[in-house]
């Protein structure tokens, strides 16, 4: 199986899952608890990504709203309070290579920034401190 369950919930691609569990254990030794925000914030199927996308975006224009283009159509985020979301099929979550980390601020964020690269993880976007992506570990 290419996807592996991680505790307390969620799934990641096998190599990402092993690196996540190693990183989680190292964080625990430093008094930091790492966990996904929810089971849908690790691997997401295309259908899950589509459902989440359609909940956050609409076709009707909204002045000044963040946009995404999907299937040749411009979509507008429904509220500026909502975090942006990749189009279905365009997310690292769809590959099991991303995790949204719960409570990723303060000491948890500081620990991640200082240590994540040792385990093959990185922050993809500064604007999303909770979102980390697995890029692999050195051979």
Segments the model singles out, each with a brief description of its role:
Residues 1-139:
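Cell-envelope/glycan interface and biosynthesis
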């Amino acid at each position: 199986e290419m996807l592996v369950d991680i505790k307390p919930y969620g799934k990641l691609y096998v190599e990402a899952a092993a690196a996540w569990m190693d990183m989680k254990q190292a964080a625990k030794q430093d008094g930091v608890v790492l966990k996904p925000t929810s089971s849908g914030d690790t691997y997401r199927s295309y259908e899950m990504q589509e459902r989440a996308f359609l909940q956050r975006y609409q076709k009707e224009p909204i002045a000044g709203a963040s946009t995404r283009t999907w299937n040749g159509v411009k979509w507008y985020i429904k509220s500026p309070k909502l975090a942006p979301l990749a189009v279905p099929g365009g997310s690292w979550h769809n590959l099991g290579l991303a995790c949204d980390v719960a409570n990723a601020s303060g000491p948890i964020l500081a620990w991640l920034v200082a240590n994540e690269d040792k385990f093959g993880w990185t922050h993809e976007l500064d604007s999303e401190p909770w979102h980390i992506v697995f890029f692999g570990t050195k051979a």
